[in-house]
Amino acid sequence: MRSETLRRAASLLVVLAAVALVGCGHSAPPANAELKAAIADLEKAVVAAKAEVQRLKDVDDLENLAGIYGHYVDKNRHDDVADLFARDGVVEIYGRGAFLGQDRVREYMHNLSPGSVGPRDGSLFNHMHLQTVIDVQPDGRTAFVRSRPFIMFGIVNANAQWGVGGYENVFVKEDGVWKLGYLHGYYTMYTNYEDGWTKKATPIFGEYARLPPDRKPTVQYAAYPAAFVPPFHYKNPVSGRADHYGDPTFHDSQKQ
């Protein structure tokens, strides 16, 4: 759907540009005030259409980048994951704390499976990104992306787990390329496969003893059966109200 919208916007841009050029290049006598105003309106429309085409392209790029992150991290491609981050990027996953800068992000990712890179026989690790909400900011260099991960994890003949949560991520355009600026993952429910969430719930994970964070967790919360909703970066698009759990200054506080 986004690709079709992008094509239509591009077509509109071509039409508007052509009309504007015809008006500007007409060999008739000097344009009167009405024609000048019409040409000015067309020029504004071309500028607006160009901005909308760029925004739609940014949305497509961001959706792809979020999905690519998921594919890489699931298969232990730690360096590929770290390469998706900005130079001063940050990763913060549940209670592990925050790791600042691309080098520390890389260290954190390798710590997820020490001594192992790439998919492993007998190991399952998938988390799908669902319900993605993408908001490109007016500056065209910052974007907020919210999604819901559905997690499947297991070791054959050993154990299996599943879980859900939420991502509230900040993306930045660095050197003309969208990158992860702040990856913030909240896991709100974890349980083993056999018992399920009706019988058992795993407490939120804490800091790694072997890899202390650069900063304590930004948000303190308890996982299921406690009720916690990650703060929304956006207001209700119809009413304009901020959600009860949301905070309009949420991302500003994370950047400090």
Which stretches of residues belong to each language-model region?
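Bacterial N-terminal signal peptides that target proteins for export
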Residues: 2-13
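Bacterial N-terminal signal peptides
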Residues: 11-22
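Terminal "cap-and-tail" regions of soluble proteins that handle hydrophobic small molecules
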Residues: 25-60, 175-256
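Short, aromatic-enriched amphipathic alpha-helices that serve as compact interaction elements
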Residues: 58-74
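A solvent-exposed, acidic/Ser-Thr-rich amphipathic alpha-helical stretch
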Residues: 78-149
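Hydrophobic/aromatic beta-strand elements that line small-molecule binding cavities or substrate pockets
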Residues: 129-134, 166-172
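Beta-strand elements of well-folded, non-transmembrane domains
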Residues: 149-153, 171-173, 187
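Short, cysteine-centered beta-strand-loop-beta hairpins and adjacent loop/turn segments enriched
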Residues: 152-161, 190
